[in-house]
């Protein structure tokens, strides 16, 4: 097998632990959401996303209702673009004030640097907003890794479990699907990428998945427990 022309990676459960997102980022955004909306609700960018939330629930409602809705969506882990954008803005404040740094697995940081040094373009596709992705990599445990990434994609390119999203990404980066390796911990995402013609690898980390996924579940995807095990 020839080396891929590009590598596309997920974040949560792939480069980084699920627990960091669930136990640090989500609760931080939930706690900060009321004060953030009250303080910044008239800012055009914030209002744009709040209006999208109002459109989603189909009512002209006060901000307090929008705040409650957003907190409920956080609890439900909704992949709504407006929620992800607002979370990203809030996390930006947290990174800037050093309330936390983003978790990156050591093997992921090492391998991303090695691939970048070898001239393989790296791309990120996550349900988190592009600004949030950039902040995540810029303020990681391993330092500023944002310069390793050529481009970033979020759910504005499409849902992660639909093959059309991966075809759009391939078109945008100008690399044929079979020459792109997609890394994720979610089998349904890998299935969608494979239907779009991409190579795929399942990250099945014991820290995030104590019970290994079965061979039937993994199917034809390459399965690894760390980036160091990946075969290009």
Swiss-Prot record:
Catalytic activity: 5-methylsulfanyl-2,3-dioxopentyl phosphate + H2O = 1,2-dihydroxy-5-(methylsulfanyl)pent-1-en-3-one + phosphate
Keywords from the UniProt entry: Amino-acid biosynthesis, Hydrolase, Magnesium, Metal-binding, Methionine biosynthesis
Entry GO MF terms: 2,3-diketo-5-methylthiopentyl-1-phosphate enolase activity; 2-hydroxy-3-keto-5-methylthiopentenyl-1-phosphate phosphatase activity; acireductone synthase activity; magnesium ion binding
Cofactor names: Mg(2+)
Pathway: Amino-acid biosynthesis; L-methionine biosynthesis via salvage pathway; L-methionine from S-methyl-5-thio-alpha-D-ribose 1-phosphate: step 3/6; Amino-acid biosynthesis; L-methionine biosynthesis via salvage pathway; L-methionine from S-methyl-5-thio-alpha-D-ribose 1-phosphate: step 4/6
GO aspect biological process, one term: L-methionine salvage from methylthioadenosine
PANTHER family xrefs: ENOLASE-PHOSPHATASE E1
Name of this protein: Enolase-phosphatase E1
UniProt source species: Xanthomonas euvesicatoria pv. vesicatoria (strain 85-10)
